[in-house]
């Protein structure tokens, strides 16, 4: 007799299978990097990525000879020392600043290079991001030579409808912007993205209205901002894409409890769209719960390898 399987169960099995195939590869990645330790690395890029935009940009900047390391994986090392000819940080711009985990990683690590660069990925505005990153890095003995940013899909769901973002003409400029940035870094140019008076006005207005912390604005507790709905099938993808490992499966359903970066990796990568955001005034409710985003050049497996804390 032929057995049947519904879509819900099939997706659950796919999710569990994906976790199983991704997890064994983590030690292999670490091993590859260890083997290269004795060789002088040309370009070393550290990245933080929730929906794949920053990972995609990192790959483009790395080229054939660059080495990529995930910040959520590297941050657990004690007193790490990294050395390369060029060292870069690629991360999303969260509330006009680098994510708290990126700040913590820089503060805990020692970097040795002839050339340092930062590239942010953002949707609407960078405002003071270049200045903040430059001053923050300088406080830990790093002189940034180059700071720029790439405008991409804005994935912050309380304010942006992903469906509209995907239709925005700004996305057509991504290849050109990346080409300019890559050429500049290859030539070791000295540059910092300008911060205008309008940028400062937007920054000040946002923080006055929101009341967020101006150093670590997105740090919170996961149970305060996200929850899984009845659409959850217990596939476990959220437990592996969270850079803090703050999701767990309890009786076949995902439960969020723990530190949160507010990166929304869990929300965007859930195959069932079963994770929703709890509105935090003055922020509105998300305008479109039916559309989620992951960079088309990055797979869920890529993000699991980058972020999993299991």
Language-model-detected regions and their locations in the chain:
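Iron-sulfur cluster-binding cysteine motifs and their immediate structural context
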Residues: 28-30, 227-261, 265-283
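C-terminal segment of N-terminal export signals and the immediately downstream linker at the start
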Residues: 25-50, 56-63
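N-terminal export signals
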Residues: 2, 9-30
């Amino acid at each position: 007799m032929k057995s049947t399987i519904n879509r819900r169960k099939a997706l659950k099995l796919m999710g569990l299978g994906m976790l199983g195939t991704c997890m064994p590869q983590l030690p292999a990645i670490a091993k590859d990097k260890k083997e290269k330790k004795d060789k002088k690395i040309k370009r070393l890029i550290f990245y933080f990525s929730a929906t794949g935009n920053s990972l995609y940009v990192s790959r483009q900047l790395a080229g054939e000879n660059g080495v990529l390391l995930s910040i959520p994986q590297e941050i657990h090392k004690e007193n790490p020392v990294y050395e390369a000819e060029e060292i870069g940080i690629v991360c999303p711009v969260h509330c006009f600043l680098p994510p708290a985990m990126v700040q913590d990683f820089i503060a805990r690590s020692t970097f040795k290079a002839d050339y340092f660069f930062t590239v942010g990925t953002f949707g609407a505005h960078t405002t003071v991001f270049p200045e903040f990153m430059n001053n923050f890095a300088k406080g830990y003995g790093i002189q940034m030579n180059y700071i720029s940013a790439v405008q991409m899909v804005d994935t912050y769901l309380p304010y942006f409808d992903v469906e509209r973002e995907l239709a925005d003409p700004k996305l057509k400029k991504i290849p050109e912007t990346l080409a300019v940035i890559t050429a500049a870094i290859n030539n070791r140019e000295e540059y910092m993205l300008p911060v205008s008076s309008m940028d400062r006005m937007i920054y000040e207005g946002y923080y006055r209205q929101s009341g967020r912390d101006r150093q670590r604005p997105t740090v919170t507790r996961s149970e305060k901002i996200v929850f899984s709905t009845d659409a959850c099938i217990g596939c476990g993808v959220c437990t592996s894409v969270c850079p803090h490992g703050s999701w767990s499966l309890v009786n076949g359903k995902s439960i969020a409890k723990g530190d949160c970066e507010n990166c929304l990796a869990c929300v965007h990568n859930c195959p069932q769209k079963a994770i929703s955001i709890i509105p935090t005034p003055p922020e509105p409710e998300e305008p479109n719960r039916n559309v989620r985003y992951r960079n088309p050049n990055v797979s869920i497996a890529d993000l699991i390898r980058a972020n999993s804390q299991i």
